[in-house]
């Protein structure tokens, strides 16, 4: 083992955070220094030249001053016996650089801890420095050799039921966490006695996963008796009733990994069989899926949320015969945050068990995990919600603590699929059964069964064993394979595909062959395996991520294999399909068959559940408002996390990748996160698209189960009504149900809620629920040490509805931004509560530690339908200037958020509304506030009247020029604050979370910027005509210069880049680095080259650096690239990851001596922003005629800080005239202030060119915003093109 010292691993503020945690734990630590340590396992010794090459490979990241280490060593490495995702990618890079003797390279962090610490205190510090789920600690470097040990395979065991009977299996059930019900134990004993043998542990694990509540949804399929009366339908049948009543536009429901609805016809953009990107006119259907990943997120929030998103993405990709995930959503419900130093008056501490983390930890790490996976995979995350609730209340079961110690972690999204791929094909006998994706590792074992238990029923080791790990770059490679398959149309080699989720291969392969009407013979040792010491059940049942199972016909296999090799996606043929429905898993190592079962024993005839339950009634207590002050209530509500600003959850997630995002969360020139819904364009040549929104009112279930469900459905509609969708038939719903099954009253309540929407509301509205998910163990129980009394926190019955819709014109989406540039306007409240003002389970009740008695409800489905249809008429006719639904926090919050987005004052008169001031301002009845031009008032009122809304529509106010938010009742002022006062209160939660999680200096700068009353917001200044197509004369010649759209494994922004160059008149050619390294393509044939954005090699060895070094240290590749850059008829562009890559290649590129390196952002966080930049005077072929222009652009990167050697180097770059693009503030001044400069680069530098202008690199993404509609905000006068299209047309003009 070769040990190589690496660069410092922690910045100053990261060290300070560790020291602060040590001080909180009263540990006498005076200093901590950390640096990376690399460990190389070699098959033969390296020459001195090879070792130098390896050392250069392992030199990466920002320049931080090195120290001479002092103090006690705590070496943190990946857990021995595992291969980390970092190692697999770093090893790939080493091999691509010719270092074949490197069997594996791993990375650790060497912490040097100073201070007078005894052994116990050092152990406590060690616990703070590592994650026991994925890491191990050592006291000396030599111990890292354990990383490369290879254990002998362990044998399977069996449970002796032939002699021990039922009792033997019952004991094993508890010890191994199978979560088998009593009748399932009986069923297994009976069947194995029939087979005349004992069950192997692998068979029991497999059965437990395949038949867990998580996988088989036993409660939703159960028969029900409530209060002694048999019920006519199961829960699932009531959901299916919505489809039976309204099947229109549903192409697939209930039978696949995701549901599919009718989409739009447009030009799908992807490479043809010759590799040139082109439009393919076809129906682009919409697929939808929403999952939850609650149990793992309570144990390990980052990995739990990351793998939740990853599993949902795989569900989408594995729909039909392969499809394309497009846009994501994420949501969290947790108990009270109790941010230290920022605790709120309603946040009581009811304790928690030691095995789960705090709500604050979940909301610190969980969103980062979900965002990181989506970012690296390349899916924009455009929608979400965040709710906190934890309170002792009197509900259906009397006085008890209700909250979310077991959190809700929601992961979902939409995608697209070809019509002829919606239905899975037949699996031919003899078809190859393939595992696509990563290797088996001993992680996530028993996840399906563990998540099916109430938290506290399994032991702590099993809880930790049930959490999976994430490798999104691997999943991206797999998706590229799936994409290349579906793009072949009729020649698609995939006959059948499933994702690998709960239960691992032991669930996925049986499901695959069973659904395809076949059986299967499998070879256990053909499964790619990074932990050879695993026992058979661990190999077969582990939940290693980023895997799919597929059936490919023998005649199609060569084509499939070639695609996998080009994309460098790991695959293995594990078995073949058989005509007999039997499952055999052979083990060549031990020469036995660990699994040998008829499929119907595993999947077919397990006992059906029967639920015999009793309903309970709640007697609420009316909300006591006698001591509630209107102003105090407003301040509390703005600090309730459910209502407070969500920027800390949003800017960590890429919202522009694909270049198809038409509406993200951030609204208007001030980028305020208040959007009602998310909207995407179907493709680059159309305005058709897709929308999705969320609806949830979970606390209402504490008073009225059915009303809570109805409110969730209704809120999803009031959120999506601002998009141009048309008929309700164009909307389909996903329903995600969470309940504490078995808790008194909750089962009957669940039945009541499902019936309310499945049998009643959705059929009345014409809505269908073709997809959903349930999680039935939402209760946490524990005993404190030394206390025999059991404690518990039980979640309210929770329904999260996601609405998906086909959009006719994505340009017509209305946002909450109040418009100050449209003349005289009025605000109208449409009150679907019709003046009832019911306050039960409201946010106001929560912040005063009450519950209330009567909740809002959907009293009239017809009125709700009328509201939706009226909004659709007004949206289609462009009569609405702004729209925002009323929800948490009531009218006050709705109006305040609209004012924040519009950067304006507003005056509201509630004189025409019923109820007292508190009820009028803070009730959460359904409805919306719309802004309309006074010149359109008559037309708008006529539409409202035509839809039965006249009597519940009230003109409530208008804008003011005082920058104040004022609520009056007649001549009396009820509430008055400056907009800035309320805006900064609303921002406090996000500031507190950012300051704790990220660089506190950056967090403070962002918070302080919100006090700037005169901030003009994003603005545009152009020195050219953006509608002039300067490439048109060249396109008219018919010549299409070949443009290499270059990508490496993990790159994810190549499609939008190709679309931009295609529009400019180039022949955009798909070029993978493997094409160059293996000689399939040469750069000699191209005039232009663009290195695209993404996460090449998952940013291992530095962002873009691994990609660059695979060129620099590969003689053939180095020669090709150097030759290309030196040809005077070529030009090149690097964007984001491509910018980082080309800047590392600068020794090959003439005239780039002033180029910086691009390293970790100053915030040390991935930054997704819509930032203002200015083009500088520079020689770049891309920016000809654009100097002095100022316009916004998408930014999405974690390592974009331009690092120069020193201040003199910065000055030299500026003096050279090669700086091309700078970040500027909203006043037009170059800036280093965060977040206007999201990475902290000196002088705002974010783009630079070579001295001759032929090579240009920039961190922001022009290719994602070349269409006007893809900009988060743009001036009304922009038509189809944004100003960034000029860049690509300049390149075409340059070629001539």
Curated annotation (Swiss-Prot):
Q: Where in the cell is it found?
A: Cytoplasm
| Annotated residues for binding of Mg(2+) | 715, 719, 885
Region listing for Disordered, in residue ranges: 300-325, 1232-1253
For this UniProt entry, the molecular function terms from Gene Ontology, in alphabetical order, are: ATP binding; metal ion binding; phosphoribosylformylglycinamidine synthase activity
Q: Which residues form the Glutamine amidotransferase type-1 domain?
A: 1043-1296
Where ATP binds, per the record, is at: 304-315, 675, 887
Is Plastid among this UniProt entry's keywords? no
* InterPro entries (alphabetical): Class_I_gatase-like, FGAR-AT_N, FGAR-AT_PurM_N-like, PurL_large, PurL_linker, PurM-like_C_dom, PurM-like_C_sf, PurM-like_N_sf
Please identify the protein, giving its name as recorded.
Phosphoribosylformylglycinamidine synthase
Name the pathway it acts in.
Purine metabolism; IMP biosynthesis via de novo pathway; 5-amino-1-(5-phospho-D-ribosyl)imidazole from N(2)-formyl-N(1)-(5-phospho-D-ribosyl)glycinamide: step 1/2
SUPFAM superfamilies, sorted: Class I glutamine amidotransferase-like (SSF52317), FGAM synthase PurL, linker domain (SSF109736), PurM C-terminal domain-like (SSF56042), PurM N-terminal domain-like (SSF55326), PurS-like (SSF82697)
One GO-annotated biological process of the protein: 'de novo' IMP biosynthetic process
Q: What quaternary structure, including any partners, is listed in this protein's UniProt entry? A: Monomer.
Which domain of life, per UniProt?
Bacteria
Q: Which GO terms describe its cellular component?
A: cytoplasm
**Encoding gene per record:** purL
Record field: catalytic activity: N(2)-formyl-N(1)-(5-phospho-beta-D-ribosyl)glycinamide + L-glutamine + ATP + H2O = 2-formamido-N(1)-(5-O-phospho-beta-D-ribosyl)acetamidine + L-glutamate + ADP + phosphate + H(+)
User: In the UniProt entry, which residues are flagged as the active site?
Assistant: 1136, 1261, 1263
Q: Under which EC number(s) is this enzyme classified? A: 6.3.5.3
**Stated family:** In the N-terminal section; belongs to the FGAMS family.
């Amino acid at each position: 083992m070769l040990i190589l010292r690496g660069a410092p691993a922690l910045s100053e503020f990261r060290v300070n955070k560790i020291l602060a945690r040590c001080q909180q734990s009263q540990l006498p630590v005076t200093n901590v220094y950390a640096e990376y340590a690399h460990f190389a396992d070699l098959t033969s010794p390296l020459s001195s030249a090879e070792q130098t090459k390896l050392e250069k490979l392992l030199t990466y990241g920002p320049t931080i001053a090195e120290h001479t280490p002092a103090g006690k060593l705590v070496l943190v490495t990946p857990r021995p016996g595992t291969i980390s995702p970092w190692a697999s990618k770093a090893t790939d890079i080493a091999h691509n650089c010719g270092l074949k003797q490197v069997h594996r390279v791993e990375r650790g962090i060497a912490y040097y801890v100073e201070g007078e610490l005894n052994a116990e205190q050092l152990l406590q510090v060690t616990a703070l420095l590592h994650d026991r789920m994925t890491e191990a600690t050592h006291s000396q470097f030599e111990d890292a050799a354990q990383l490369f040990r290879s254990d002998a395979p362990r044998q399977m065991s069996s449970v002796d039921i032939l002699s021990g009977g039922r009792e033997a299996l019952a004991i094993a059930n508890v010890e191994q966490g199978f979560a088998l019900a009593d009748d399932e134990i009986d069923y297994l004993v009976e069947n194995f006695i029939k087979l005349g043998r004992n069950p192997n542990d692998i068979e029991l694990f497999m059965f437990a996963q395949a038949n867990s509540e998580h996988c088989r949804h036993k409660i939703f399929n159960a028969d029900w008796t409530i209060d002694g009366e048999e019920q006519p339908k199961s829960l699932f049948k009531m959901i299916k009733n919505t489809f039976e009543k309204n099947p229109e536009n549903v192409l697939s429901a209930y039978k696949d990994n995701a549901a599919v609805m009718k989409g739009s016809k447009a030009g799908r953009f992807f490479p043809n069989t010759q590799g040139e990107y082109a439009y393919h006119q076809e129906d682009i259907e919409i697929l939808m899926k929403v999952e939850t990943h609650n149990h793992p997120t309570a144990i390990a929030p980052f990995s739990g949320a990351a793998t939740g998103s990853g599993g949902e993405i795989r569900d989408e990709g594995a729909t039909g015969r392969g499809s394309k995930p497009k846009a994501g959503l994420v949501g969290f419900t947790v108990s009270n945050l109790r941010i230290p130093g920022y605790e709120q008056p309603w946040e009581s501490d009811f304790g928690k068990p030691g095995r789960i983390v705090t709500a604050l930890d979940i909301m610190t790490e969980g969103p980062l995990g979900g965002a990181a996976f989506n970012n690296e995979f390349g899916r924009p995350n455009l929608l979400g919600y965040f709710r906190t609730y934890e309170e002792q209340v009197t509900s259906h079961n009397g006085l008890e603590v209700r909250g979310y110690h077991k959190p809700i972690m929601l992961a979902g999204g939409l995608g697209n699929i070809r019509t002829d791929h919606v239905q899975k094909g037949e699996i031919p006998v003899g078809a190859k059964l393939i595992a696509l994706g990563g290797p088996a590792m001993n992680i996530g074992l028993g996840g399906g069964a563990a998540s099916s238990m109430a938290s506290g029923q399994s032991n702590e080791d099993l809880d930790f064993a049930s959490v999976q790990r994430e490798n999104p770059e691997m999943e991206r490679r797999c998706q590229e394979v799936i994409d290349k398959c579906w793009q072949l149309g009729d020649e698609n080699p995939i006959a059948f595909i499933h994702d690998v989720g709960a239960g691992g291969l032991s669930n996925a392969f049986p499901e695959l062959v069973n659904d395809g009407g076949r059986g299967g013979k499998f070879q256990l040792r053909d499964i790619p395996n990074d932990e050879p010491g695993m026992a058979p059940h661990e190999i077969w049942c582990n939940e290693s991520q980023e895997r799919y199972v597929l059936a490919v016909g023998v005649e199609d296999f060569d084509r499939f294999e070639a695609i996998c090799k080009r994309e460098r996606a790991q695959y293995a043929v594990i078995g073949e399909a058989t005509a007999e429905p039997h499952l055999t898993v052979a083990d060549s190592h031990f020469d036995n068959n660990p699994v040998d079962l008829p499929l119907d024993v595993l999947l077919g005839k397990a006992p059906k559940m029967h639920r015999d339950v009793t309903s309970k009634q709640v007697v609420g207590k009316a909300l006591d408002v006698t001591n509630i002050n209107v102003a105090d209530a407003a301040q509390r509500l703005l600090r309730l996390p459910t209502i407070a600003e969500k920027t800390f959850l949003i800017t960590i997630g890429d919202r522009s990748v694909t270049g198809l995002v038409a509406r993200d969360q951030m609204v208007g020139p001030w980028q305020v996160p208040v959007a009602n819904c998310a909207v995407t364009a179907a493709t680059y040549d159309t305005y058709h698209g897709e929308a999705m929104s969320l609806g949830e009112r979970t606390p209402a279930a504490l008073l009225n189960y059915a009303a809570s469900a109805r409110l969730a459905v209704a809120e999803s509609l009031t959120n999506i009504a601002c998009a141009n969708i048309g008929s309700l038939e164009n909307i389909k719903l996903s329903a995600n149900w969470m309940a504490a099954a078995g808790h008194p009253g909750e089962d009957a309540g669940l039945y009541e809620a499902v019936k309310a929407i499945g049998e009643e509301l959705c059929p009345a509205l014409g809505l269908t629920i073709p997809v959903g998910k349930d999680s039935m163990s939402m209760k946490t129980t524990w005993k404190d040490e030394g206390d025999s009394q059991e404690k518990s926190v039980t979640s309210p019955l929770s329904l999260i509805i996601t609405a998906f819709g086909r959009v006719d014109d994505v340009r017509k989406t209305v946002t909450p931004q109040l418009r100050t540039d449209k003349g005289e306007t009025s605000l109208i409240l449409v009150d679907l509560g019709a003046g009832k003002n019911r306050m039960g389970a409201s946010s106001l009740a929560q912040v005063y530690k009450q519950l209330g008695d009567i909740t809002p409800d959907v009293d009239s489905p017809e009125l709700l339908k009328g509201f939706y249809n009226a909004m659709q008429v007004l949206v289609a006719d462009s009569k609405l200037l702004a729209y925002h639904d009323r929800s948490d926090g009531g009218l006050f919050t709705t109006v305040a958020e609209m004012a924040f987005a519009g950067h304006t004052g507003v005056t509201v008169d509630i004189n025409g509304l019923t109820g007292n001031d508190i009820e009028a301002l803070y009730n959460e009845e359904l409805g919306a506030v719309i802004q309309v031009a006074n010149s359109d008032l008559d037309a708008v009122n006529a539409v409202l009247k035509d839809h039965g809304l006249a009597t519940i529509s009230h003109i409530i106010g208008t804008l003011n020029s005082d920058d104040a938010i004022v609520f009056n009742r007649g001549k009396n002022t009820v509430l008055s604050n400056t907009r800035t006062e309320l805006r900064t209160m609303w921002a406090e939660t996000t500031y507190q979370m950012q300051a704790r999680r990220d660089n506190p200096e950056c967090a403070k700068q962002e918070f302080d910027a919100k006090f700037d009353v005169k901030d003009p917001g994003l603005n545009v200044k152009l020195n050219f005509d953006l509608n002039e197509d300067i490439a048109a004369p060249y396109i008219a010649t018919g010549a299409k210069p070949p443009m290499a759209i270059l990508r490496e494994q993990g790159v994810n922004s190549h499609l939008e880049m190709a679309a931009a160059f295609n529009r400019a008149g180039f022949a955009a050619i798909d070029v993978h680095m493997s094409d160059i390294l293996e000689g399939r393509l040469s750069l000699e044939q191209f005039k232009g080259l663009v290195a695209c954005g993404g996460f090449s090699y998952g940013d291992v060895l530095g962002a873009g650096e691994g990609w660059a070094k695979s060129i620099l240290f590969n003689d053939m590749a180095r020669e090709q690239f150097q030759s290309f850059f030196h040809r005077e008829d070529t030009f090149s562009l690097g964007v984001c990851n491509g910018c980082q890559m080309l800047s590392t290649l600068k020794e090959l590129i003439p005239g780039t001596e002033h180029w910086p390196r691009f390293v970790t952002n100053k915030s040390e966080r991935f930054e997704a922003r819509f930032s203002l930049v200015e083009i500088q005077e520079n020689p770049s072929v891309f920016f000809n005629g654009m100097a002095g222009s100022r316009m916004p652009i998408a930014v999405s990167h974690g390592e974009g800080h331009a690092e120069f050697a020193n201040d003199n180097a910065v000055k030299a770059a500026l003096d050279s005239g090669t700086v091309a693009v700078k970040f500027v503030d909203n006043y037009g001044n170059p800036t280093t202030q965060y977040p206007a400069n999201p990475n902290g680069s000196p002088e705002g530098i974010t783009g630079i060119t070579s001295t001759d202008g032929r090579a240009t690199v920039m961190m922001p993404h022009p290719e994602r915003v070349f269409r006007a509609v893809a900009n988060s905000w743009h001036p009304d006068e922009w038509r189809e093109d944004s100003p960034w299209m000029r860049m690509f047309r300049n390149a075409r003009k340059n070629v001539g």
